[in-house]
Amino acid sequence: MAGWIKKVKAFQFKGILVILGCFLLIGAILFAERSGLSYREKAKKLTYLDADKVVMEETAIKTLKPTCLVLTDSSQANSTMAWIQFEQIFKDMKVGTDLVDVNHESIPDDLSDYETVVVLLSDLSPLKENVLKISDWVKEGGSAMFALTLQKDTYVSLIEQKLGIVSSGYTDAMVNSIYFDSEFLVGGGKAYKVTDGYESAWAVELSQRARVYAWADDTSGVPLIWEADYGNGKFVVDNFGFYEKAFRGFFAASYSLLTDVGVYPVINGSVFYLDDF
């Protein structure tokens, strides 16, 4: 041991060893810093739902209790077009429905089992005296929606005052742009242009008890969506006269006026996460 110490003392390049040691220490520190903190990931156990327990949309819809009566007329083209949109709306909103084609079927005698009635007819003549049955049901606390632009005739005249209408004619008004109330839709409070607009709205004037949520953005100001209380219930009327997919959201918002609570999913939405650029 003493001999080894003498050799170290006699070594002429002891300063170089110190410098070399410093470099080795710095290298070790840099290596540790570049390597990062090491960690051990815990094993994850993934649990998948059995395929036979997955509930498909069509199955879920069939299990819903029918709370909405939908009246259509297969002989009216716009009724068929509107039902295509409303069928999807009711699926998205998880609303159970009973569908009645008044061209072949009779509406139920008792409407008390339903919370809402949606009438997808512009010509109400196939309903005949059932128009009054629906209005009486609304007066007792029901909620009904006329989703198509109505054609003025004898049966419409029977209920137009109950719908909040004080004056009407046999003419239709042009709809080139729709202005929405700010409390009706997200993005409301301004007007939206309508591509290929035409005379699609029934020219009417409403009473003060009617609350208007959308109207034609022109000098006529024809009301396009409104609600009117009647007795213990209410009517909702869509008067814009467009039945394409692009207007599905307007129908859904109108339907939500019938009930205290409405749920509608955000569709066609995407989230993108960008990193390392």
Language-model-derived ranges and their functions:
Residues V118-S125, G241-E244, D276-F277:
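The substrate-binding groove and active-site-proximal loops of carbohydrate-active enzymes
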Residues Q76-D153:
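Helical hinge/lid and interdomain linker segments adjacent to catalytic or ligand-binding clefts
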Residues L64-C68, S143, S200-G269:
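A glycine-centered loop/beta-turn motif at secondary-structure junctions
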Residues L124-G189:
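A glycine-rich, often tryptophan-bearing local segment used as a flexible ligand/cofactor-contacting loop or short
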Residues L69, L99, T116-V119, A144-A147, ...:
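Structural recognition of the beta-strand scaffold that forms the well-ordered cores
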Residues S35-A60:
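Ser/Thr/Pro/Gly-rich low-complexity linker/stalk segments immediately outside membranes or between
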Residues A2-C22, F31-G36:
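N-terminal Sec-pathway targeting helices
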Residues A60-N78, G269-Y273:
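Short hydrophobic beta-strand segments
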